[in-house]
From Swiss-Prot:
Record: active site: 124
Cofactor: Mg(2+); Mn(2+)
Any one Gene Ontology BP term: DNA replication
HAMAP family: DNA_ligase_A
Free-text function comment from the UniProt entry: DNA ligase that catalyzes the formation of phosphodiester linkages between 5'-phosphoryl and 3'-hydroxyl groups in double-stranded DNA using NAD as a coenzyme and as the energy source for the reaction. It is essential for DNA replication and repair of damaged DNA.
Keyword terms: DNA damage, DNA repair, DNA replication, Ligase, Magnesium, Manganese, Metal-binding, NAD, Zinc
CDD domains assigned to the protein according to its UniProt record, in alphabetical order: BRCT_DNA_ligase_like (cd17748), LIGANc (cd00114)
Residues that hold NAD(+) according to the record: 47-51, 96-97, 122, 145, 182, 300, 324
Source organism: Francisella tularensis subsp. holarctica (strain OSU18)
Highest classification ranks of the organism: Bacteria, Pseudomonadati, Pseudomonadota, Gammaproteobacteria, Thiotrichales
Protein name (Swiss-Prot/TrEMBL): DNA ligase
Amino acid sequence: MTPNEFFSIKYHILAKAELKAYIDKLADYLSQQSYLYHTLDKPIISDSDYDKLFRLLQDLVNDNPQFKPINSVLDRVGGEVLAGFETIKHKKKMTSLANVFSLEELRDFYDKIEYDIELECEPKMDGLAISIFYKNGKFDYAVTRGDGIQGEKVSENVKTIRNVPLKLNTSNPPEELEVRGEIILDKQSFLSLNEYMQTHENKTFANPRNAAAGSIRMLDSKVVAKRPLKLYSYGIGYFSKDFVYPETQFELMQLLQSFGFTISDNMFLAKNFSEVEEYHHKMSHQRADLAYDIDGLVFKVNNIKLQDTIGYTARGPKWAIAYKFPAEEVESEVLNVEFQVGRTGAITPVARLKPVAVGGVIVSNATLHNINEIKSKDIRVGDRVIVRRAGDVIPEVVKSLPQYRKSDAQIVEMPTNCPVCDSKIENVNDQAIYRCTGGWHCQAQTTERLKHFVSRKAMDIDKLGAKLIEQLVAANLIKYPADIYKLNFEQLTGLERMAAKSSQNVLDSITKSKEPSLARFIFAIGIKDIGEVSSDALANHFGSLESFRDAKFEELIEINYVGEIIANNIVSFWHDSLNIKIVEEFLAIGIKIQNPVKVEHAYNESFTGKTVVITGSFENYGRTELTQLLKSIGAKVTSSVSKKTDMVICGDNAGSKLTKAQELGVEVILEDNLKDLL
């Protein structure tokens, strides 16, 4: 589905099962977009659409709390960790800020605090978030945000950045200090880097953020050292007990500057909301003239004690907010409209544009979402149009400018046949989405289905990337999933740019994937609308592929995360003889699906049946590890303290949760006592 399709649904008239299915689908979609943005640095939707979809999910869950998805983007930050670097757990979770999009919403945030307070104001840098750890004042290691719980250790690359202190400029450093900031590439350096890349026939970067993120993730730090990256610090994370915390956020930033860190020279201390508005007005007008890209402004309660009182949500602090700038818009001309085919056959119109610069990037393509969108906006080939590039990702055509329309402008019509395989295109139930009916007979769908099949959350054949899949399909070496497991060394080495070593790596990766879990297999076969969460639920419920194949509609709709839509899709999938043949061929070549093992919770007198909250950081446990351990012995782990909480497990640097637990008289357990109880 596309963002516009999610927006067009009339959720208030849906049956409960359908509503639940769409909430799950939206949560899965946002998780995937988060992974593409934070982990792969390859977003396919705009920041604006992501923010609107996130808010839509929040609203739906607020109205229907019984349908709240488990482990969704509502509870998490960011994306998962790439392979290739050592994974390090954050000593203190790297959270993100809630967003607002207007001065009215910013005013609401200010008024909710219920204090006439000072706000520290700063630009929101558009780069890569980083945590740098110092021991006794000396650089120890650096970690990316990752999924907020753990990230990639990129110390050697970060040490090459000229303005990163390798030793704190103080005679009395704390024993441990984690400094957080944003790694960026300024506009001029970005243009110079792309010019260099183009001259040397290398792939250029789409924008400064991607250039910064891509540089930090390079394995050769010598190359990174040649790139003029910069670090702008915005705060601290973990700190040892000997660190003397300033009384205000503004003083904290001055302290970091005295330690040798670069901070924004556009920081400002607003004493009231009128000054907040003045700062907003000033920065909005100066944005284009800044040396670096910013995508918004950040406002933080200045008083540190008040920050602690206001507290946190699962996603981040309640005492800070990010104001996001509107998307950048320019004019261009539609030269042509082409139709692309996705994994499920969805037909997406794409405008080919007269190249135009938007935010320092040349744009020549823009999504038109669907044919209904084209009709409602009356967009024609030859029209002058407004193009928006929000958050430096895939542009979209916002509207046409009919006052400039030429007499030969062509109306865009949905083709009756697939542009790739010539199969009939159908529209079911008069929805916005049209689909190619070719299925596995359509090369475009085949290619996208196989890319999905080998992806990390499916069969996880990590050496078989998207480009290689395209090569193999084009060469008629693979058409169905089972064909992947029939590939041989000679076939692979016969392809362009496939040497002996890389070919063997692919074969080893394929062999390694031959014992998938049932949940991975269900996700991999690509049943429409089934994501990770519903795959897990189905695997745990049925316990085997045989039982899943025999599932009846009535049984399916009783399962968590499976509504009528998904249930119908599952039944339809197993009624298709080609799907059955594909799965049987797959099993015939020796794939061994691992059925889930149902583990009975061990009984623990202290924790079984208890509601537990975890706060602070721990010397001997990661937060995720401790959560899983407690759940394995029957505890219910929640994110907030209430009268229903039985105990709070408290580590170092515990904040408002500890305070609230003490106020409510909830039992507090320190790490020193935890091991004995476990």
